[in-house]
Design a protein with these regions (language model features):
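Non-catalytic C-terminal accessory modules of carbohydrate-active enzymes
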Residues: 24-25, 346, 382-543
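Aromatic-rich carbohydrate-recognition surfaces in CAZymes
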Residues: 45-46, 122-128, 135-223, 248-256, ...
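Inter-helical turn/loop segments and adjacent helix faces that build the functional surface
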Residues: 184-196, 262-277
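Pro/Thr/Ser/Gly-rich low-complexity, intrinsically disordered linker/stalk tracts
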Residues: 525-554, 592-606
Length: 731
């Protein structure tokens, strides 16, 4: 079998000119990684009828063609060696690193910022921030800083990228800017930058505390970080206001990381009171994440909570959020190890989330994003899971080799980058993830304000000697050599003397670090489950006192939920209901895979619902904008929401989401959001985010006020039309 395989590779290489003489060199026979889809040996990657290899350390060739049928090849074109010279254990290993550095330089814009990808110009807050965390904060800190500075608005707040319903707060992950800002400081020690970044971060967090934070759950609202294509990850019925209400693992993990580094910033800057406050907030959020998202029977954190009046937890795992829970220390040691070994993985890598939504195209859904794979690989190294680290490295090597570039994404169950809805080569966070995973595993980079620690995690099959020469760190040039494999250091010499594998931040000049690994790894595993399909969500109607829906393919039963809790199971497609409440139905497959719940169906007698005509405009004038008197017939819990239109932009574009504070009898209750519902769609009325309040019997004043912290990302255009107020008494 091995002979046949090598003959096939040799034949492929002769036919495509990958080897000058058609000979498979001895080192190419060493197999690094193989599964049923692809093989990675020392100097080539083979998948089906395609192969790729590196003739030199400055060139990668492949039999794969571009999407339009043209040959693919990478050849170095930039001065990459001023960022250090990497020498791996094979020509391909070295060439792939060189390609990532080369593509990093390709993304340098004339204005000193970083381009997002070959096809996408401009700076995106989350793209540059996550790229910074992966490697760019120390590879090109000046470029990252310049990029962060263009994502500050004139009010001194972080700019949220374009997103659902008019950007912030439906999308709320802009705070990852702070993680990048802190990592620039760790890499450079630049106090001037820290002093500039800190007030921008704290002002943004203050707005989020009022508009995004939910004190009832202790979590932050807004769609999953970077997973911002609505129907790609949410049920199709979800309106922008529903997506704002969702509480997501990745976004909350990011907020935790931000609160933690903001406390660290405050401490460095001498703000002891603020440092304590942010540290306490971080600890409270950490507890809330563990309480609300952890699913013991699955061994990982759930992706998000969603709904309207009542919230439901999804069954999904979500790779970026899971990875952050490990990397940021949200998960304790036991949970962290369990997350990496339990979350869903496929042969081409970990999916963005799992299970998949059959009716949706490939992008976030049914997609692998190499930068997320890199975060997952780093998290795997942290918990010392050799199989996961090896799988992450192999999947990144496979795609970069076969397509001779660092793509943004590819299809989860085929590995094809050409079958996703949108993609770009030379992608900033793809290339930064590739470099970052090399740095974390082969050299063990860990930056702190005290200096650079080296804690390599080299898989056994990748044992060998690797060098990173003339690597710039602060006022130093470092020559680093790591030999062997394993997760523990056997010996370390710094400048020829036995020492800890640590370089103090205040050193200057040239230094040599030589590390030999012990060659040991503990047993590890991953959960290779492949493609799992969700059943479709039922579409439910109320008819003669019964909930009714059409049969769902592959459903073995249906669960009926009232006010967020399962109250019945049935194999039929109807359910009698006799009580007032909010009803939902979900399909469950024979393997226990849940669909999304159906759109929440309000079943209330007329006596429980009041609707008052308003016909008012929300505009840019700070202060009270709407005031309505309502008579409440009995004391109890009520849901307040507003019928509104916002035609300032498409659901998926622009930044005109309107946010206002709900005041009842002069007391600030909560933020209510009025997202965009379609460009010029001023007759497309829907409902704002709801607020649950306790009201006593009698007359109350219900008002909407526009406060400075409500101001949207656009600043200049912040309006909506309010048609009516609805108050629903909960039974």
């Amino acid at each position: 079998m091995k002979k046949l395989f090598l003959t096939l590779v040799a034949g492929l290489c002769i036919s495509t000119g990958l080897f000058a003489n058609g000979d498979v060199r001895q080192d190419d026979k060493k197999q690094n990684y193989a599964n049923s889809k692809f093989v990675w040996t020392q100097n080539y990657v083979v998948e089906g009828a395609n192969a790729a290899m590196a003739p030199t350390t400055e060139e990668i060739v492949t039999t794969c063609l571009s999407k339009d049928g043209k040959p693919l090849r990478w050849v170095r074109k930039n001065d990459i060696y001023k960022y250090g010279k990497f020498t791996g254990t094979s020509t391909l290993e070295t060439a792939l690193y060189n390609m990532a550095v080369d593509e990093m330089i390709n993304n340098y814009e004339k204005d000193g910022t970083l381009r997002t990808g070959l096809y996408w110009g401009g700076v995106w807050t989350r793209d540059v921030s996550y790229s910074s965390l992966l490697s760019l904060a120390y590879m090109c800190p000046d470029k990252v800083r310049n990029s962060l500075e263009v994502k500050i608005d004139r009010m001194g707040r972080i700019i949220q990228d374009t997103g659902t319903g008019g950007s912030w707060p439906c999308s709320s992950d802009r705070v990852v800017w702070a993680l990048s800002a802190w990592n620039i400081y760790l890499a450079t020690g630049d106090m001037e930058w820290l002093e500039k970044a800190y007030p921008i971060i704290t002002k943004s967090l203050a707005c989020d505390d009022m508009v995004v934070y939910n004190p009832q759950t202790g979590l932050y609202r807004g769609e999953s970080s970077f997973i911002d294509w609505r129907e790609q990850s949410y049920p199709t019925w979800a309106q922008p206001a529903d997506i704002y209400l969702s509480e997501c693992l990745g976004t909350n993990a990011a907020f935790y990381g931000v609160l933690k580094v903001t406390a660290d910033m405050a401490s460095v800057l001498g703000y002891k009171k603020e440092a304590k406050m942010y540290a306490q907030k971080a600890e409270a959020l950490k507890q809330a994440i563990n309480d609300k998202f952890w699913v013991e029977e699955d061994g990982y954190y759930a992706s998000y909570w969603y709904g309207r009046q009542n919230m439901i937890r999804t069954q999904h795992s979500e790779t970026l959020g899971e990875s952050f829970c490990v990397l940021f220390g949200i998960a304790d040691e036991e949970r962290a190890a369990k997350v990496i070994s339990s979350m869903h993985v496929g042969e081409f890598g970990p999916p963005i989330f799992s299970p998949q939504i059959v009716s949706q195209g490939n992008y976030h859904n049914n997609g692998v994003w190499p930068y997320v794979t890199s975060f997952w690989g780093k998290a795997a190294a942290q918990v010392e899971n050799e199989k996961a680290v090896m799988h992450a490295l192999a999947c990144n090597v496979r795609t970069a080799s076969l397509y001779a570039t660092n793509y943004e994404n590819y299809t989860f169950n085929t590995g094809n980058p050409y079958t996703t809805l949108m993609n770009s080569p030379n992608m900033l966070w793809g290339l930064s993830g590739f470099m970052g995973l090399y740095h974390r595993t082969f050299f063990g980079f860990e930056f702190s304000k005290e200096g650079l620690s080296l804690k390599p995690f080299v898989p056994s099959v990748l044992a060998g000697t690797r060098k990173l020469e003339a690597f710039p760190y602060r006022s130093m040039l470092l020559d680093i050599t790591v030999s062997g494999s394993g997760n523990e250091i056997a010996s370390c010499k710094v400048d020829g003397k036995d020492a800890d594998a640590f370089i103090p931040a205040d050193w200057t000049g040239k230094h040599t670090i030589e590390i030999v690994m012990k060659g040991e790894h503990k047993p590890s595993s991953i959960n290779m489950v492949g493609y799992i399909a969700m059943p479709e969500a039922p579409v439910v109607q109320m008819n003669a006192g019964k909930l009714q829906w059409k049969p769902i393919a592959n459903a073995s039963k249906y669960e009926v939920l009232k006010d967020g809790k399962v109250v019945a199971e049935t194999t039929s497609c109807e359910q009698q209901v006799a009580e007032d409440g909010e009803y939902l139905v979900r399909a469950v497959s024979a393997k226990g895979v849940h669909s999304f719940v159906s759109e929440p169906l309000r079943v209330y007698t007329d006596a429980l619902v009041q609707q008052v005509n308003v016909d008012k405009w929300l505009d840019n004038q700070l202060g009270e904008q709407v005031k309505v008197k309502v008579a409440v017939p009995a004391s109890g819990w009520y849901v307040v929401d507003w019928e509104y239109a916002n035609g300032n932009g498409e659901v998926e574009q622009r930044n005109h989401c309107a946010n206002r504070q709900l005041y009842i009898d002069g007391k600030n209750k909560e933020t209510m959001v009025f997202p965009q519902r379609g460009l010029d769609a001023w007759n497309a009325y829907g409902w704002s985010s709801p607020v649950k309040v306790y009201l006593k019997k009698g007359t109350h004043q219900v008002a909407l006020r526009y406060l400075e912290k409500n101001i949207n990302i656009n600043i200049d255009l912040d309006k909506a039309h309010v048609k009516s107020l609805r108050i629903t008494r909960l039974p």
